[in-house]
Amino acid sequence: ELAHDTATLLEAHRLGIMDAVALKLSKFGGLSATRRARDLCLNLGAKMCVECTWGSDIVMSAALHLAAATDPARVLNVCDLSGYVTPRLAPDAPTREAGRIAPPTGPGLGITVDVDRLGPPDMILE
């Protein structure tokens, strides 16, 4: 639960206290950084939970794809909390059925985001 970057992963491994780790996209700073953390955990022999901290449909789709691209023997679980977040941002987002969930199969993250639900941007960089 306390891991949030490469340094914390390496320190936990050095101390011998990292049998498993929660990789949260929001804590690591997005999908690319979490993928690098996942790769490090694979190299260090740790098992993983792949998730986000109360993420939306968008972030949950990313987490599902990351988990699906990881050796199943190393994934303990994927915690889906997106169903509790409102409003839902993608009508075709994956949902749990009988305790299971799978990544969407469309292009990109596999979902169609309802951009009207996002609201105006806080910042535009040009």
What are these regions (language model features)?
Residues 88-126:
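C-terminal extensions of enzymes
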Residues 3-100, 104:
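Shared catalytic-loop signature of beta/alpha-barrel
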